[in-house]
Swiss-Prot record:
STPGR repeat spans: 180-205, 216-241
Subunit structure: Microtubule inner protein component of sperm flagellar doublet microtubules.
Entry protein name: Ciliary microtubule associated protein 1A
Family: Belongs to the CIMAP family.
Chief place where the protein resides: cytoplasm
UniProt keywords, alphabetically: Cell projection, Cilium, Cytoplasm, Cytoskeleton, Developmental protein, Differentiation, Flagellum, Repeat, Spermatogenesis
Pfam families referenced in this protein's UniProt entry, alphabetically: SHIPPO-rpt (PF07004)
Amino acid sequence: MTEEVWMGTWRPHRPRGPIMALYSSPGPKYLIPPTTGFMKHTPTKLRAPAYSFRGAPMLLAENCSPGPRYNVNPKILRTGKDLGPAYSILGRYQTKTMLTPGPGDYFPEKSTKYVFDSAPSHSISARTKAFRVDSTPGPAAYMLPMVMGPNTVGKASQPSFSIKGRSKLGGFSDDLHKTPGPAAYRQTDVRVTKFKAPQYTMAARVEPPGDKTLKPGPGAHSPEKVTLTKPCAPVVTFGIKHSDYMTPLLVDVE
């Protein structure tokens, strides 16, 4: 009997718990959404209309007026209180009899000029600081207008002449040899005034518009593999063995 050679540290052993991949359906640990109610309803089923039940509403009292605890004045109307003019009588204000002027507050000797005829009297005070007798402008404070030149005021002015430097043009020192020569003028094109021959412009070659994308060549096609228009033998496809731990595809959710 030959001994089996094991690779690594794994050895065949009994599973410690259930392997969830062996089950094709969800176990009890999954919370399946309910098919009744409104909250968390399963999206794979149609939800029927739901109705709520509640108690009967409270009936309103027949008499909604304020009770006898309110004392409403019958003289109060929507425009205010219906009353005639009323006056209030208060007590006399307290008079402070002790705050009276004494004998020293009066000057009866000064009342003669107001009661009897009196001579005019003058008062002598100190000199004011805001007014000075000698505050007149001096000779240098005036700016007399000019009496010479063209800008005189109130007088006729004589003609005035200005003296400036010598001009370089038109003078006796002007060099008449410094005149423009024939080359200083731009020559007029002959074709402006005479017959002009036709002119032609030669441009680059114009290429016709076309498709410059990459297209497949003869070796890119495989006509021997065409089975749509030609008869062919039956073809069998071999798949692979699916694992037992793979979850099956649920197509019909109903």
